[in-house]
Amino acid sequence: MIHAHSNARLLRWAILAIAPVTLGACAPNGPPGLPYPDGKPLIPINTAAPEQGSSCQTRAP
């Protein structure tokens, strides 16, 4: 259980660290706290990474 809890904390930290960057790069007009203009959830980081690459063309692959 401790391992899962630490993973959740790490995931939350990563989201908090990545969200502002995604906000600035992808959704300058989007509301604060939502990295995607579509309002997609922040939690699935596995989907967030590939989507970030495809929707944010400001970052080089």
UniProtKB/Swiss-Prot annotation:
Signal peptide: 1-25
Biased composition (Polar residues): 52-61
Start and end residues of each stretch annotated as Disordered: 37-61
Keywords, alphabetical: Signal, Transport
Key word Hydrolase present: no
Induction: Cotranscribed with ptxABCDE. Activated by the two-component regulatory system BvgS/BvgA.
Assembly and interaction partners: Forms a complex with PtlF.
Free-text function comment from the UniProt entry: Component of the type IV secretion system ptl required for secretion of assembled pertussis toxin (PTX) through the outer membrane.
Protein name: Type IV secretion system protein PtlI
Gene source species: Bordetella pertussis (strain Tohama I / ATCC BAA-589 / NCTC 13251)
Classification lineage: Bacteria, Pseudomonadati, Pseudomonadota, Betaproteobacteria, Burkholderiales
